[in-house]
Amino acid sequence: MKKITNKPTKTDETTLGLRGLCAKRASTICYMIQQAKEHGVQDGAAFAREAITKYGEDIGQVVKSKMKNPDDLLEFSQYFGAGADRDIYEMEVVAQDEDRFYLDFHYCPYVAEWQKMGRDPEEMAELCDIAMEGDRAVGASFEAFAFTLGETIAQGCPVCQIRFDKVKK
């Protein structure tokens, strides 16, 4: 596995505070899986995936309810990864049109927290994949486009590749 590089460039007080909240979520996910196993849940990771999927479904429905046209990828791009999230994850909009909405995350507070917790690279890659169930579920809330997770910081790549593509009918 590649060496993980995850260095923030945005360090204003608000962004750092919001990243702290993300770090709490990251450690909670990690500990929930660990505790589920200790309490006899055979597959703590599956348990966490299902819970995070439900969370993502809820977010997807909220976003959908705000949109005038839930088939419009440009309108969706005004809600997903908007606001403070852009700074928290140091997002770069790689493509944004009626057929594609591509984001690259240049920083991940989840990975930073898992590194502080001493998690090994393989576990971080799995934890990342579990955490991304939320975004997968957001994407699945929309029939007109599909979500794809490309490479991730947790895998040792320089960015997390978040991709939404219009589904051709």
Please name every model-derived segment.
Residues 1-129, 145-169:
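N-terminal accessory segment detector
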Residues 126-139:
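A conserved amphipathic terminal alpha-helix motif
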